[in-house]
Structure formats: structure tokens, C-alpha cells
Amino acid sequence: MRGKKRIGLLFLLIAVVVGGGGLLLAQKVLHKTSDTAFCLSCHSMSKPFEEYQGTVHFSNQKGIRAECADCHIPKSGMDYLFAKLKASKDIYHEFVSGKIDSDDKFEAHRQEMAETVWKELKATDSATCRSCHSFDAMDIASQSESAQKMHNKAQKDSETCIDCHKGIAHFPPEIKMDDNAAHELESQAATSVTNGAHIYPFKTSHIGELATVNPGTDLTVVDASGKQPIVLLQGYQMQGSENTLYLAAGQRLALATLSEEGIKALTVNGEWQADEYGNQWRQASLQGALTDPALADRKPLWQYAEKLDDTYCAGCHAPIAADHYTVNAWPSIAKGMGARTSMSENELDILTRYFQYNAKDITEKQ
């Protein structure tokens, strides 16, 4: 009986030693396969590593470096184990499928890989980001004005880091709008109009030789009998910039640019009046033949703008509501952000106008 007990204790001791040794070995393996050197042992990781070397996460004045695991692997718990298990697919694609074994293949799958990481970070409330950064530790008052606005908004709306901070350690995917969206917009142009109807250009258009009209501008049809409708354009002139008609006094949303003939053809509807900054404004209107097709409603144009926003802007940050900024603030903000995308000049113009027409100081949203 004693012999059996001793054998049982011996087996138990062996099991404890083997189990403990196995756990220590597993921990060692998990730790070793999480360091940057191991990540770089895969050829396909050389490209993202080069991108990462040009960022503040690799080199900065504080001398603090975020390694691969700091961003891509949760620190502990089941999230850590799941991340390690899911990483087995990377080994498969490296050595078996060859899915990203060339620069061309890597670029072809960049968006897919980026969206996978963004989704994982979103699901964990950007846990790996918050292991270094936290709102509690931030001196928000010392940040730039734009950073203060966005961080205060993020706290208020319970947004997470990855909602805005995409493409900060590796190049973001280059996203392009489907051309079908633009063709669909053009197909919705009004085929016939009636007197008194409101129509809206969906691209840069012309009132004869008098004016170049911007997308989204409200035009009233005054004579629909001819091949080209005669339209009425109403707006405001600013002294010193008489060749431009704006939406309202003090609001620099340009409706149209006038030629010399257009300026002469203007009907002035009031005297010059000063705004709060001393700029002089007056109402004016222009009539002429619209030579380009237009929409019967702004809705399709704004739906197209929202697609642009979702395609190009949401890849880097959470959507910013149009009423977050004023009509005069939006152009410089949109231009600065648009420069980081592959948006065309026309696409950026339409998106900017969508933001302006729905800005926080526009009383009646367009």
C-alpha cells in the first residue's frame, strides 16, 4: 500500500515538474515570439518596419520606443492568448501561401490588413494604445488647438484612439473612390425643368460667359422655355472681392466667380453694409443661361459627398460632423486634411461645400 502511495506521489511530482517546466517553456516561447526581432525574421515584415522607422513611435526626443508587441499584442489575459493564436495565420501566409511575399502583393492587401488591425483595436477600446497613453495623464491644455478640440470631443463622445489615429506607425492604405459613384451622380441630372424650380450644379458649371458656378449652388429657373434654362443666381458681394458671389454676408461660401461681363450684368439689390469685422457686403443677383446639366435636389450631391468622407476621411479618423466647425473654418480644415489623401481637386471641393452648407453657423441646413 505504501509502495503504491510512493509511486502515486512520484508520478504527481513528475507531473508537477513536467507541467511547471512546460508552462515556463510556453511562457518563454510566447515572450520570445513577441519581440521585434522575431517579427522581423519574416521577410514580409521588412516593408512595414521601414515605415515604422520614420515615425515618432520608433524615434523621438524622449527616447521611448514602442516595439511591435506594444501596439499589436495585448498585455495579458485571454486577449493576449487570442492574439498569439491568431498570429499563426501570419506564419502560414509567410511560409505557405506567399500572400504578401512581394511589394505588389503587400500593397494589394494593405487595406485588408489595416482594417483587420483597426477592427481589433476598436474591439479592445484601443487597449494597447492606452497602456502608454491615457486621458488622465494628458495635459490637454498644452496641446495644439486642433488636438484639444479632438481630444475633448473624443472624451465627450466616448471615442477610442483608433477612431482617429490611423496610419501613425505604418502608411495607411491608399483608398480611391469608385468611379461609378460619380457616373451615378451625373445620371441623376434633371432632364426637364419648370419655371420657379430650384436646380443645383453637381460640378463646376457656367452661366454663359458671365459666371463660373460652383457645385451645390442654388439656382432658380426663371425661363425654362429654351434649350438652356435661364436661371437666377442670388448672393452677396464683398468689397474688394467683387468678382465673387457668396452665400451670405460674413460667410465666405463662394457660390460663383464672375467675369468682367458678369460683374457688369449684376443687379445690385442693396447698399454696402459692414459686418462685425468691418468688411462691406451687399446683395446682388445675376441672370443668364445655364450651359451645363444640374440636379433637381441637393440630396444626391450630399450623398456623394458623404461617400467621399467615408472613403477618404474615415480611414484616418472618426467622422467629424459638419456642424462641428463654422462655414468659414471648414475650407482650411478640409484642405489640410484632403492633402493627405488621393482625393481629386473636384472631389475635395464637393466635400468642402457639403461641410460648409451644413456648418454649425448655417441656420437652415442645406
Swiss-Prot record:
Domain of life, per lineage: Bacteria
Record's comment on post-translational modification: Binds 5 heme groups per subunit.
Binding site for heme 2: C68, C71, H72
GO molecular function, one term: electron transfer activity
Binding site for heme 3: C129, C132, H133
InterPro entries, alphabetized: Cytochrome_c-type_ET, Membr-bd_4haem_cyt_TorC, Multihaem_cyt_sf, NapC/NirT_cyt_c_N, NapC/NirT_cytc_sf
Membrane topology, from the record: Single-pass type II membrane protein
Family affiliation: Belongs to the TorC/TorY family.
Role, per record: Part of the anaerobic respiratory chain of trimethylamine-N-oxide reductase TorZ. Required for electron transfer to the TorZ terminal enzyme.
Protein name: Cytochrome c-type protein TorY
Species of origin: Escherichia coli (strain K12)
